[in-house]
Amino acid sequence: MNIYKKLLIYLLLSMVVLAGCWDMVEIDRRLFVGIVGIDTSNEKEKYTFHFSIPIARQIISGEGGGGGKTVATVSTVGSSIVDGARNLALRLNRDLFFEHMRVVVIGEDAARGGLKNIINPLIRQTEFNRRSRIAICEGKAKKVMEINPWTEKLKSEYMESIYASVGLSGKFIELDLGDFLRGLHSQKGNTLVSKITPDKTEVNIGGAAVIKDFRLVG
C-alpha cells in the first residue's frame, strides 16, 4: 500500500480515536485534497480550480475494491485558489484541507497567461503542502483530473508512483512546490518546471516547461 494512502487512513482513523464524539459522518465532512488542477476560466481575471478528493468512507471501508468510487473530482471558479476553495466549501458545506495535497497541475493556457496571481496565495498561505509536486500540463489541467488509472485506487497515489519511477530516470525537472516558489523568487520569475501530458488512463511526465517573467514560454 502506498505510503500516502497509509497516512491518509491513519489520519482518518486517528480522528475517530482521539475525538470520541466524532463519527463517520463528521469525517465525511472533512475533505482532504490530493490533487489541485488550475485552468483558465471564461470569467475575467478568474480561474477554474479542480480538486481531487479521496472519499474517506470508501477508503476506510474498502468498498472501493468492489467498484465504488474512491475519489471525487469537483470544480469551481475563483480569483485565487483560496477563493476557489472557499466557494467550493460553501457549495458543498464541507471544509477543505490541503495539508496532504500531493500534486499541483497548472494548465498550459493558465501558465501562459501569467503565474503571479496563481502562486501568490500559495506563498502567503501556510496550509498548502510545500512538498507537493508541481507540473505544467500540456493542454488543460482538467484532463489530468479525468484520468482513470487502473493500477491505483487514488489518483494522487498513482501520480506519486509515476513521479517516483520517472525520478529514477532523471528525465524530468524534479522539484516540489516549495522549490518552485523559491526558484521563481530568486530568479525573478524565471525557472524550469516539469511537464505533464495526460492520456485517458495514464500520464506522461518528462521534459521541462520554461517559465520566463512568470509566464510559460516553452
Where are the model-predicted features located?
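Membrane-proximal alpha-helical signals and transmembrane carboxylates
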Residues: 2-218
